[in-house]
């Protein structure tokens, strides 16, 4: 089964993707996490991607599509949840072509609907563990010790693109480039709207009931 999580930055795609992985054994493919790993390795892809990511812009489609193609070619028949991909109509069309050649298709697209003021609060409050990747929020999901990761006591950091100036850009890019995918998948009868404004557990229950 192939699922896509679609929604504005901070709407909970990463959080729900991680739950689909831990609770239902989906392969969680987050293009954002993959790119951040390349950036911290300072690989050629990471160095290129960093220029775009720090400004809140999309990384060029050809780099992203090649990454996804590698994953699917290696293991085409797993249950996947894609988080943060596709991100524009061009990526969605390339994804469809790629899946067609493997006799696969996107089964369901979950659109996480959330108001801008909540988005901004979630993004500005997000803190992440640079060691294990765990995500926290100073407003909604505090670690036990204010500034340290619950798993390994590493000091938590703020993502560079969660700074206020970059958040504004990310929201603009989302509205211009990603939002049109809602109509794209609605037209294909694959779109399921999820109100993302509950607790993590509430949103996950809603998701499961729609699977
Ligand atoms: P990416 O990492 O994909 O960022 P994003 O889409 O902006 O999404 P986020 O990770 O910010 O938010 P999320 O929806 O996953 O929310 P989360 O669960 O973390 O992309 C980063 C960059 O990489 C892009 O700007 C671009 O440059 C590049 N990129 C990535 N994919 C690309 C692609 N396909 N094409 C081109 N470029 C690409 O939650 C956010 C916060 O809220 C957390 O603190 C969390 O604890 C909290 N939270 C979550 N759920 C709840 C809840 N129910 N209640 C209260 N708090 C909650
Ligand atoms: Zn940690």
From Swiss-Prot:
Pathway assigned in UniProt: Purine metabolism; AMP biosynthesis via salvage pathway; AMP from ADP: step 1/1
GO molecular function, one term: zinc ion binding
Main enzyme class: transferase
EC number, UniProt record: 2.7.4.3
The reaction(s) this protein catalyses: AMP + ATP = 2 ADP
Binding, ATP: 10-15, 126, 135-136, 198
Annotated segments matching region NMP: 30-59
Record: residues binding AMP: 31, 36, 57-59, 84-87, 91, 159, 170
InterPro entries: Adenyl_kin_sub, Adenylat/UMP-CMP_kin, Adenylat_kinase_CS, Adenylate_kinase_lid-dom, P-loop_NTPase
Keywords: ATP-binding, Cytoplasm, Kinase, Metal-binding, Nucleotide biosynthesis, Nucleotide-binding, Transferase, Zinc
Chain residues that bind Zn(2+): 129, 132, 149, 152
A Pfam family: ADK
Domain of life: Bacteria
Subcellular compartments: Cytoplasm
Any one Gene Ontology cellular component term annotated for this protein: cytoplasm
Residue span of region LID: 125-162
GO BP annotations listed: AMP salvage
The family this protein is said to belong to: Belongs to the adenylate kinase family.
Function: Catalyzes the reversible transfer of the terminal phosphate group between ATP and AMP. Plays an important role in cellular energy homeostasis and in adenine nucleotide metabolism.
Quaternary state and interactors: Monomer.
Domain notes from UniProt: Consists of three domains, a large central CORE domain and two small peripheral domains, NMPbind and LID, which undergo movements during catalysis. The LID domain closes over the site of phosphoryl transfer upon ATP binding. Assembling and dissambling the active center during each catalytic cycle provides an effective means to prevent ATP hydrolysis. Some bacteria have evolved a zinc-coordinating structure that stabilizes the LID domain.
Name of the protein: Adenylate kinase
Gene name of the record: adk
């Amino acid at each position: 089964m192939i699922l896509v999580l679609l929604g504005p930055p901070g709407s909970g795609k990463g959080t729900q993707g991680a739950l689909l992985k831990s609770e239902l054994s989906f392969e969680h493919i987050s293009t954002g996490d993959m790119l951040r790993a390349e950036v911290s390795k300072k690989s050629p892809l990471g160095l290129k991607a960093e220029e775009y990511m720090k400004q809140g812009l999309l990384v060029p489609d050809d780099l992203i599509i090649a990454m996804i193609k590698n994953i699917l070619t290696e293991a085409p028949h797993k249950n996947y949840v894609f988080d943060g991909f596709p991100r524009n109509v061009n990526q969605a069309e390339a994804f469809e072509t790629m899946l067609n050649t493997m006799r696969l298709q996107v089964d369901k697209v979950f659109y996480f609907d959330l108001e801008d003021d909540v988005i901004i609060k979630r993004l500005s409050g997000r803190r992440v563990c640079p060691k294990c990747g765990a995500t926290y929020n100073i407003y909604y999901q505090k670690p036990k010790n204010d500034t340290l990761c619950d798993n390994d006591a590493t000091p938590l950091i703020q993502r560079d693109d969660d700074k206020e100036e970059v958040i504004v850009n990310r929201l603009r890019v989302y509205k211009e480039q990603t939002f049109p995918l809602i109509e794209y998948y609605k037209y294909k009868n694959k779109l399921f709207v999820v109100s993302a404004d509950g607790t993590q557990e509430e949103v996950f229950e809603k998701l499961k009931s729609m699977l």
